Regions:
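Glycine-rich phosphate-binding loops of nucleotide-dependent enzymes
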Residues: 1-163
Length: 163
């Protein structure tokens, strides 16, 4: 499946035309297809993957596959997007690229991002507000600066001496 086809699957929940209309490619189905393709092309342009839009996703390196995953999610035009470990397995350059895109998602698409991430540098750089959990209990909540200086967070993540 190509990058474009993969991103287009993110639009499936937005399709309203019936089976017959789609099969005959008439009227409403044709208009929907054009509109959906335009939305997907906008997302592809935003994530700077135009040059690989016809490439099978299976041939892409890991970092680009993660970008395609983000593109597919954005194609559905969510109001809230939950990203669970979006930087997992990425090298430094890939993390920088993904961070840049995540920072711009709200401005470009009006989508709020809820991020679950263990790379605290990424969390502090990307977040307006941070909530820190330790074994299922909330131990910190505030701006990155407030959380960075929260003693409970410091103890949980750096350890505390029990002498």
């Amino acid at each position: 499946m190509s990058v474009l086809d993969n991103v287009m699957t993110g639009r499936l929940t937005q399709m309203n035309s019936g089976f017959i209309s789609q099969a005959l490619w008439r009227g409403k189905a044709e208009r929907e297809e054009i509109e959906n393709r335009e939305i997907c092309e906008r997302v592809i342009d935003f994530l700077e993957i135009q040059s690989i839009r016809k490439t099978p996703v299976s041939r892409l390196p890991y970092g680009l596959k993660k970008r395609v995953e983000l593109a597919r999610a954005l194609a559905s035009e969510p109001k809230l997007l939950l990203l669970d470990e979006p930087m997992a397995g990425m090298n430094v350059e890939e993390k920088e690229d993904m961070s840049r895109f995540i920072l711009d998602v709200n401005d470009e698409f009006g989508t709020t991002i809820a991020l679950i991430e263990h790379d605290m540098g990424v969390v502090m750089d990307l977040s307006d507000r941070v909530v820190v959990m330790d074994y299922g209990k909330k131990i910190g909540d505030g701006t990155p600066s407030e959380v960075r200086n929260n003693q409970a967070v410091i103890d949980a993540y750096l350890g505390v001496s029990h002498d």
